[in-house]
Structure formats: C-alpha cells, structure tokens
Amino acid sequence: MRIATEVFGEWADCGKDIGMEKGHALAVEDMISFAIQERANLERNFNFLDLGCGNGWVVRKLENEPLCVRSVGIDGAKQMIEKASKVDSKSEYLHENIDTYSSPEKFDLIHSMEVLYYLENPALTVKKITDLWLNQGGRLIAGCLLYTSPS
C-alpha cells in the first residue's frame, strides 16, 4: 500500500488538491463556523492550527478572520506545503509528520479534516493534541466524511 503523503503530494502536483478543497468545503465551513462563533462568544482572539492542511485553503480562510491572530498549517506531503507557501506568505506552513510532530506552542483552535484515519495510532495522537498542543479552553474540531458511492 502506498503512503498517503506520497499520493497527496502527487495530487498537489497535478491539481487534484483543488477537488479535495471543493469536496470538503461544506463540511469544513460548518465546523469552522461553529468554532469561530464559539471564539466570538468568548470575545477572545485565538491562534489556529490545521493538521493535514493540504494546499492551505483553511489556513488562509482563518487568517482572514478578525479574531485569528496566528494561523499555522502542517502536512506530511511536501508538495502540498510548497503549494500553500507559494500562495500565502502570511501564515506558517510546516512539512511535518503529525504522528511525530512536537509543537513548540499551544493553540486555541485545532482543525483536522480527513486525516485521523491515516495516523499510525489515532487515539494516541488525539491524546497528544489535547494534552500538549491545545490551550486550556481550546477546541479540537475534526471531520471524517462518509462517502456512500465512489467518485
């Protein structure tokens, strides 16, 4: 079986990342809208981390939110990070393996879409995220879509 980061790197090279963005847009919009409203209700600025950021489209979306003071994306596919960095010099993009990444800072909002099932040990990684990367009172919001037919 091929490693997911290799496949997604090839997708970045051939433009398939745009299809991923479009396919996930509605679900991500719901998740992010909920989290942003929650932050607004707290009347606090927040920093944001996108795990498995792909071409950075969610990072760019959050960097334009008035309460978001910092927006960071990490992805295991080097080509995705290169693509994200080319179109966005304001945010930080890191080529990292989520399973082994050690964040030097904590975040108020951590987002992940269609990533958890690629991890070596999802439960352990989620524990690491909540214990070490998420600020007290922060929010981890993750999504996995269920497709009922191949596309």
Regions found by a protein language model. Name each.
Residues M1-N41, V58-K61:
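Conserved class I S-adenosyl-L-methionine
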Residues N45-N47:
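Nucleotide donor/acceptor-binding cores
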Residues L49-L51, N55-T100:
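Class I SAM-dependent methyltransferase SAM/SAH-binding core
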Residues H111:
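A conserved beta-strand element that flanks and buttresses the S-adenosyl-L-methionine
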Residues E114-V115:
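Short catalytic micro-motifs in class I SAM-dependent methyltransferases
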Residues A123-Q136:
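A short glycine-rich, Lys/Arg-flanked "PGG" loop and its adjoining helix->strand segment in the class I
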Residues G137-L145:
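Conserved beta-strand signature within the Rossmann-like core of class I S-adenosyl-L-methionine
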Residues Y147-S151:
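Conserved small/polar residues in nucleotide/adenosyl-binding loops
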